[in-house]
Amino acid sequence: MIPEKPNDVIWTDDQWKSIYAKGQDTLVAAAAGSGKTAVLVERIIQRILRDEIDVDRLLVVTFTNLSAREMKHRVEKRIQKASLEDPSNTHLKNQRVKIHQAQISTLHSFCLKLIQQHYDVLDIDPNFRTSSEAENILLLEQTIDEVLEKYYAELNPAFIDLSEQLSSDRSDERLRQIIKSVYYFAVANPQPEQWLKSLVSPYKDNQAQDEFLELLMNLAKVFMNTALENLNKSFDLYSELAGCDKQLEVIEDERAFIARAMEGGILNTELISKHSFISRFPSATKKIKEANDGNLELLESAKAYYDDYKGAVEKVQQDYFSRSAEDLKADMAKLAPRVEVLSQITRDVIDTFSKKKRSRNILDFSDYEHFALKILMNEDGTPTDLAKHYRNGFDEILVDEYQDTNRVQEQILSCIKRGDETDGNLFMVGDVKQSIYKFRQADPSLFIEKYSRFSHDGTTGMRIDLSQNFRSRPEVLSTTNYLFKHMMDESVGEIIYDEAAQLYYGAPFDDKPHPLNLNVMVEDKESELTGTEQEAEYIANQVEEIMNHREVYDMGTGSYRKPSYKDIVILERGYNRSRELQQAFKNRDIPFHVNSKEGYFEQTEVRLVLSFLRTVDNPLQDIYLVGLMRSVIYQFTEDELARIRVTSPNDDYFYQSIQHYLKTKEADPDLVAKLQDFLKDLKFYQEFSLEHPVYQLIDRFYNNRLVIQYFSGMIGGKGRRANLYGLYNKAIEFENSSFRGLFQFIRFIDELIDRGKDFGEENVVGPNDDVVRMMTIHASKGLEFPFVIYSGLSKSFNRSDLYKPVILNQKYGMGMTYFDVEKDFAFPSLASVTLRAITEKEMISEEMRLMYVALTRAKEQLFLVGRVKAEKELDKMLNTAISNNMLPMSYRLEVKNPLQLIYAILAKYQANHLTNDLKFERNIDELDDAIHPYAEIHIDEYSDIAQDIHQNEDEEFRTVNDIVNYQSTNTERQQAIETQLDYQYPYQKDVVKPTKQSVSELKRQLETEETGTSYERVRQYQLGASTYERPKFMRQHKKRKANEIGTLMHTVMQHLPFKEERMTSAELDEYIDGLIEKNIIEDDAKPDIRMDEVMNFIKSDLYLEIAQSDQIMREMPFVVNQSKVDHQMNDDEDVSIIQGMIDLIYRKDNQYYFVDYKTDTFNQRRGVSDEELGEQLKARYKIQMYYYRSALETILQKEVKGYLYFFKFGTLSLEETEKH
């Protein structure tokens, strides 16, 4: 009996009911922001206080360990508070002790406790341990190896066919991946063996095939009905237009086809699969356009409807019935043996894997659940005596996040709960609209089934809807309601978004409007930025807009405050665009944090070490061997690698080519020496790896080759160093497993990469750090932010799983494509087509739920961001917005991204601008407040945005001196600041001096010191007076400046071919055009290239000498310790690192030369000879050339000669230049 609710309590009626309802199983459908955690904690407290239940007689199951700890802490605090208020209450005193034994944990923790207490039932050693991730991955791989080896030895015909279908000529990796997928699906089922055995049924059973066919027919009919509607609309519009007889004739033929294909409401799949369209639909000629001058929009709409008709039919042809129903069924029997053998292989894997784990005395998380189920359930599905014991031990079982439960977990709960649904003691809370973990085998259908069965009066189990939202403004809620009322139902979305599912306003905000902003950016094709980079700038612009023009409402004080960066979150489906966002925010000095370790294995330094490890393990892997040789560690050039390969082009492996090259008489002695050093290194590491663990091999490589030091000196050095140490630590963790050896470690890493698991630099940002955060929607679940920017709406849904040769589904089993081994050709089968269609529907349903989670994180305002290449892409979405009804099911099943759903719904705002045939059924203003959308749609050209940014920066631009010389009106504060700033740091000289300096900077430093000027003063002056170069996408096209032309000329020289026969003017012109085609230089750059000066260089002796040289290296970067090249440095001076870039180095007759191109312009004064001018020019660059020469000689350990080439003067040899 639910107690009467007092007037002064804070709980809503539904919350009150959720706290006190009992006597039956109860499902609380708690919408986002409805206070479900508070309700769950209050229910636990009231069961303890009011019903005097001991806290250890409650089983509370949470989704994460963190949630369990937080909930236990909250319950403990409430018990302590109640005990202090009633110190004589013995029951409460006991609870303060029993809370430490309370079962408030994840289900895995509960299962582990069961196993520890009843290991004897399982016949396992009580000293078992949980396997590490590495151990579990490698043991499963080893198991699959052994099982497949057995099948390869037996050569079963069905297995041979399966292997032919799922393996390539070089690898059976795809077969292995599919076995793993089937394994993971099986163990997410309460009875894996039975589920695996059932997979073959649809391939043998006609009744099961008919059920598949019915599912497929129903989906196909959706698209055929849509096709018919669109064809009729096209016909009606063309009928109103003049001169469209040919179009109407084609449409009449298609209407006849549709009539035959859908006759009697039954699809003629034979006819559909063979139907072909006219190759070219009659176009709207000039005569037709003139005849319909006032109705051109209708003419376009008529053609658009025909295109939509054609698209819907082609969807049925391509995805459902590319072959007739009979042909699809015919191949099912042929596939049965392959499905059966795949099922048996997986059962063998489960059995062998289990034995291996038992021999090592280890369990994994899947074992937790299945062993617990074995303790609680007999083989016939009835509860064991131990299960009955636990039923009596728990007065109530409370489950948080019930929508994320899988069927194994559901079975465990069923074994220990009391009674049926009508008189049970199971309390479940969750929100199926936030079920976003299907990839972890979460099964939202469990929630949906109960939601449909249970009733508000509790006669079939109690269902309570918590719909009042205490987080968000009404504009956020009503617009979210409006969106999902038009996209989510049972057919796509898996639940009806009705009044019970809607969000209702419950937070005490003021009445100030905060409409949702749907911002669609149209890409600028002329911009040098990619579309992703443009969108990142667009998002950064939105953040600035929030910071400058929005406020945050404080509910406690009823007043507004300025926003902080931490009030803003950027939500995306994944982290793949995080780098572009980081750069855009860095450009604007906005603090930004990405809470992700994704992309770790793609980092340069990690890829280098993995290439090293793979090469040491097996040098017959060309990609890794060549990658290691080309790396900064060994520095083989492309030219050297090509020479090695050319010597023996028919070798299977590059390693063999190396061996052959070393035996070639014409081999370059320097390259031979370099190769011998490399092979010596490789042999050392191979021998070392045989006697030492992997982490010691990595450590030795790091130390011998100064890997840590090198990458620490690069941009982002701290993160790179952390990544390198992360790999080292992973190797230590691997060593603690029962596996050993380099091969096994590489296998472990490969599996992590395949699973998309990353481990990188730990960079934790606390909740109070004032930064804009970027996170995935999954990571944001349970969190809230004043401002949410939900971006990446144009990113396509991941449909890759739909095109795999084997598709899996917990309910419908396995869909395998038919592969004709003799014809080497794959055909869709009835099962593969049906499961692809079902999986596609489930995938889009989950994407909708992800959208719901994203939208409901916002408290103040939502900003949705998408992008299109051209505004016309929005037209099709707009054509869908024809009424206030649900979006057509066919449209929802075909959408490629969230924008196509959201824009199609919110575009109803543009009703007044649509053509006559697209008017809405009723006015949007007539809608109820709960689903009335408050939104603004902005379609912005990126070129306009870039121009706005440009203008704003011009208005607000300040030099560093402007800021330094700013006069404050707050004298007291100014004095306090000046007191702090007046402190004289004793080592100021070393602060001014940078740790890393370019050669050009050193040249300026030494030149100013020679003239008696303080370098520090010069540097400060340059800093204060300079402004930063504006990015190219913000600049209007102007005539290039001298420095830009210099850069352009260097780019041309960087790629210039060197040929002994010299290039002609025509060939040079063709070469420049090639650079433009490859986007190496800009389209409009050609007029600024001084072609005559380049030709003069080609005609020079220097060009010919380079062309005839033995080796050429271009744009050679270097980093060297200053003390190695500057012998005048004192011992007590702090050392800088010098970095630079040499235009070209060539080697001839074992002598190295470098060339530095100069585009200086100068006037030769009267009376000054060429020799005198040459000396003046050499003097101008003597410092820079000194450092170039010294750096190269330090690196090469050989004497180096150099040339300056002035395009306005010619070649100057530095051989006579005095060394300083």
UniProtKB/Swiss-Prot annotation:
Keyword Isomerase found: yes
InterPro entries: AddA, DNA_helicase_UvrD-like_C, DNA_helicase_UvrD/REP, P-loop_NTPase, PDDEXK-like_dom_sf, PDDEXK_AddAB-type, Restrct_endonuc-II-like, UvrD-like_ATP-bd
Cofactor (UniProt): Mg(2+)
Residues in UvrD-like helicase ATP-binding domain copies: 9-473
GO molecular function, one term: 3'-5' exonuclease activity
SUPFAM superfamilies noted in UniProt: P-loop containing nucleoside triphosphate hydrolases, Restriction endonuclease-like
UniProt keyword list: ATP-binding, DNA damage, DNA repair, DNA-binding, Exonuclease, Helicase, Hydrolase, Isomerase, Nuclease, Nucleotide-binding
Residue ranges occupied by any UvrD-like helicase C-terminal domain in the UniProt entry: 474-782
Family, per entry: Belongs to the helicase family. AddA subfamily.
NCBIfam families noted in UniProt: addA_Gpos
Subunit structure: Heterodimer of AddA and AddB/RexB.
UniProt protein name: ATP-dependent helicase/nuclease subunit A
Organism whose genome encodes this protein: Staphylococcus carnosus (strain TM300)
